[in-house]
Amino acid sequence: MAKDREAQERRRQHREEARAREQAARQRTRRLRLIRRVGAYAVAAVLAGGLGYWAYAKISAPLPGQAMPTQGNDHIPAMWSPHPPYNTDPPTSGWHVDNIAPWGVHGTPIPKELQVHNLEDAGVAVQYNCPQGCPDLVKRLEAIVKAHDKYVLLAPYPGMDKRIALTAWGRIDKFDEFDEARIDRFIKAYKGIDHHKR
């Protein structure tokens, strides 16, 4: 009988040990699942935070050029029709004729009343002032403008106070030294944005 009791006691101990091992294994599995879940949430939170920061930085980054008050988009019958003066030179908004200048490179100045309509129609104007001529500058500006198939003009603009002017609807940037990155950033920021009243 004592042997039976000992055998029963050993079986009971084995069962308890097996239960304890199973319980420990279940706890390890639960812990691993919890760690994986927490890890996945942490990775998702870091990714969401990074994406949110990137979007915020992109949205809050200052736009190129200087913002100017717009002067409306009234049409006038002809380029020589009287109208109030523009608030920028070259103009960035205001009175203009019904048609637009062809997109691309121009060898002669584009009348203000014509180029303003191009700006309203989603365009960007790149203009230069070189009283003594500047073929190298013009060639570099042409290369930039030709890289954009539509919505960009290049033309001389005699008499302005800087060598280079970039204009879009309600925006202007003027400077003397060629800066390809600055020009390209301005064009990419504003070309293709239509400004017609809806």
Q: Language-model segments: which ranges?
A:
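Hydrophobic single-pass membrane-insertion segments
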Residues: 52-63
